UniProtKB/Swiss-Prot annotation:
It is found in: Cytoplasm. Its main location: cytoplasm. This is Large ribosomal subunit protein uL2z. The gene is RPL8A. NCBIfam families: PRK09612.1.
Length: 258
């Protein structure tokens, strides 16, 4: 009888523990308050820092507390072109300058934004990866909503009170640089999660994977498997509608979609 394979072992065990030891902290907008709703607050970028496990750089921004004699430090996802010593403005009356944070209703159609809120006050969840940006498509004043185009190309309707940062996230083109060696991949993933290296099933022994064994690396049977297959057998192309290259009408439809 074969062993408990990797796909089965992944499902067992304790709750995943994130690799957060050297992380700089959560990157969020300021908590939404009276000052941002009705005017603006001024902050200064004190440093641009690298956060292990994250592709985009972070900006540490210092604000004066609105009504106490102290300072507030916030971590923002850095926008392309942001620099140390730059003044940032957050609020309804802030200007349209890269790095400033405004509600979507104050941003004109066609503007490039990033780190967009999904719900008012959630401090930014959309278009946050390095090089990402969203585009403001249209405003609907009747329902007080805004339609935006996400990095995936899909369109989304969010409340017009949601905040966004002007510009696109810094670090664009990061994935275009090749890894070149296994050591770089090792250091990349060790600060993210235990997801590397991945051994292929055909490279294993028959006891370790249904695709293992043989005098050369081949699966030896159909790679498709039914939806209700038992654990340990359910590997490969699960409940696939079709396999192989797109040909004919399907290829033409896919090319048209791109």
């Amino acid at each position: 009888m074969g062993r408990v394979i990797r796909a089965q072992r992944k499902g067992a065990g304790s709750v995943f523990k994130s690799h957060t030891h050297h992380r700089k902290g959560p990157a969020k907008f300021r908590s939404l308050d009276f000052g941002e709703r009705n005017g603006y607050l001024k902050g200064v970028v004190t440093e641009i820092i690298h956060d292990p496990g994250r592709g985009a750089p972070l900006a540490r921004v210092t604000f004066r507390h609105p009504f106490r004699f102290k300072k507030q430090k916030e971590l923002f996802v850095a926008a392309e072109g942001m620099y140390t010593g730059q003044f940032l403005y957050c609020g309804k009356k802030a200007t349209l300058v890269v790095g400033n944070v405004l509600p979507l209703r104050s941003i004109p159609e066609g503007a490039v934004v990033c780190n967009v809120e999904h719900h008012v006050g959630d401090r930014g969840v959309l278009a946050r990866a390095s090089g990402d940006y969203a585009i403001v498509i249209a405003h609907n004043p009747d329902s007080d909503t805004t339609r935006i185009k996400l990095p995936s190309g899909s369109k989304k309707i969010v409340p017009s009170g949601c905040r966004a940062m002007i510009g696109q996230v810094a670090g664009g083109g990061r994935t275009e640089k090749p890894m070149l060696k296994a050591g770089n991949a090792y250091h990349k993933y060790r600060v993210k999660r235990n997801s590397w290296p991945k051994v292929r099933g055909v490279a294993m022994n028959p006891v370790e994977h249904p695709h293992g064994g043989g005098n050369h690396q081949h699966i030896g049977h159909a790679s498709t498997v039914r939806r209700d297959a038992p654990p340990g057998q359910k590997v490969g192309l699960i409940a696939a509608r079709r396999t192989g290259r797109l040909r004919g009408q399907a290829a033409a439809s896919a090319a048209k979609a791109d």
